[in-house]
Amino acid sequence: MTDRRGLLAGALAGSVALASRPASATPAVRFDRAAYDRYIALMNAGDLAFVDHYAADVRFVMGLRGRAAVRAFYVRQRPYVRERLAVDFFCSDAQGAAAEVVSEIRCIRDCDDPALFGRPLKAGDVQRIRGCLLYVLDPAGLIAAIKGPPPEILQPWRSLG
C-alpha cells in the first residue's frame, strides 16, 4: 500500500514529465486572429503589403493565380474604390482559417471600365457584400488558397451621395 506522500510524489513526477514533452502534438496556429486582424488592417488601409501574407502561387477566389496577379488586380482597382472589411466570424488551426466578412466597396472616382466592377461606376456608388472565406495555408503558414461560395450581395451598387 502506497502512502499519500508517495502518491503525491508520483503525480508530481508525472506532471513534470508531461510538461517537459515537446508540443509537437498541437502545432502552433500561425494565422491566428491577431495575424488575421493585421492582414485585414492592411487591406482596410489600402496597403498592398497585405499580399505578403500570400504564398507566391496563391489561388484566389476570383480565379487569380499568384501573389503578383492579386497585387496587380488591387493596383488596378485602387484608384476607383476604397474597400472596408469588417470581420463577423473567424476561426483557425494550423492548416487554415475560415472567416465571415462584410465588405463595403465605395467608389471614390468615376470608372467607365465595366471589366473592373461588372458595370461603370460613379463616385459615391456603394456596394455591400458578405463573404464566407476559407483560407488554406502552406507549410510556411502563408495563404496558399482563398476559396468560398459567391458573396451574398447585401446592398447592390447604388449612389449614396
Residue positions per predicted region:
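C-terminal and inter-domain tail/linker signature
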Residues: T2, G6-G14, L18-G161
